[in-house]
Amino acid sequence: MKQEVHRIQEETLAELQQVSTLEALQELKVKVLGKKGSLTAQLRKMGGLSPEERPIFGQVVNETRDILEAAWVRREEELSQAAMLKQLEEEKLDISLPGVSLPRGHQHPLTKVIEEIEEIFLGMGFQIAEGPEIESDYYNFEALNLPKDHPAREMQDSFYITEEILLRTQTSPVQIRTMEKQRPQLPVKIICPGKVYRNDDDATHSPMFHQVEGLMVDRGIRMSDLKGILLSFSRMMFGESREIRLRPSFFPFTEPSAEVDVSCMLCGGAGCRICKGTGWIEILGSGMVHPRVLEMGGYDSKELTGFAFGMGVERIAMLKYGIEDMRLLFDNDLRFLQQF
């Protein structure tokens, strides 16, 4: 029986040298070491041996198996290397041929504007904060000084999921969540970019649009600080020659409140069809944070003050690039998008 095992070993080693493909190598392995292989069959003969002979014969078979498996590994490496060299030889590339350029992608104008806004405010020391788009009525309205049945709620048509859950109508809830999380640390200095949802759909409105809101809370924050920040932003976004003006307005979460206009990019303030002859274009809303909002965020309104502002990214993009219809930003028309 030992002679038979040695014969299988010698024949198999000889056949290994004749094998020329990985497929044939695998077939030979199954033929010898598989469940019905010739070497495996030798193990079944152990039942006819005496108890003294069995361990000796088993050791011979196992040693032979180890020798063959090592030989298989070496031969497999040789064949794999040969196959790779053959493939490289057959698949040579003619590098003298002219290359074929792939279509180049374009960054969406909204993405470009959002990243530019973030870059500007990060340079001023603000941090980026984010929050959920599906929001509770408390964070979206009540914590922002808009209790239930407040008349100002009619300013926004909201998408409610349940009586207490809705798609956020602004990114302001992130400000409350950040104040709650950060208190009592100062300063709070964040911008909140994100998607918001309102029931509007026309040339200048979309049911889903993007906002960037900002918040700063600390000791001694004044309206002049707000104006300085927004003036710097406007000049970095629209050009160094831009001026801004603040017009009195009303927002439930700020007091005093102001709409912010920038001098017209087209006429420089002389008056044209874009600015409707006024020389000014509205870009965002702002104001000093209402004391109640500070209290809802966990800060002492007698010791601290703050300012907030918010802008629609689509409006900023339309003004920056001269886009007249907001819906173009969402139509996925490559003729339009490839211009940016």
From Swiss-Prot:
Compartment(s): Cytoplasm
Q: Which UniProt keywords apply?
A: Aminoacyl-tRNA synthetase, ATP-binding, Cytoplasm, Ligase, Magnesium, Metal-binding, Nucleotide-binding, Protein biosynthesis
Q: Enzyme group, top EC level?
A: ligase
UniProt-listed InterPro entries: aa-tRNA-synth_II (IPR006195), aa-tRNA-synth_II/BPL/LPL (IPR045864), Phe-tRNA-synth_IIc_asu (IPR004529), Phe-tRNA_ligase_II_N (IPR004188), Phe_tRNA_ligase_alpha1_bac (IPR022911), Phenylalanyl-tRNA_Synthase (IPR002319), tRNA-bd_arm (IPR010978)
Its EC number(s): 6.1.1.20
Cofactors that this protein relies on: Mg(2+)
State whether keyword Cell cycle applies: no
Q: Please provide, alphabetically and separated by semicolons, the GO molecular function terms listed in this UniProt record.
A: ATP binding; catalytic activity, acting on a protein; magnesium ion binding; phenylalanine-tRNA ligase activity; transferase activity; tRNA binding
Identify the main location.
cytoplasm
Is S-adenosyl-L-methionine one of the keywords UniProt gives this record?
no
UniProt subunit comment = Tetramer of two alpha and two beta subunits.
Indicate the family of this protein.
Belongs to the class-II aminoacyl-tRNA synthetase family. Phe-tRNA synthetase alpha subunit type 1 subfamily.
The protein, known as: Phenylalanine--tRNA ligase alpha subunit
Organism, by scientific name, is Desulfitobacterium hafniense (strain DSM 10664 / DCB-2)
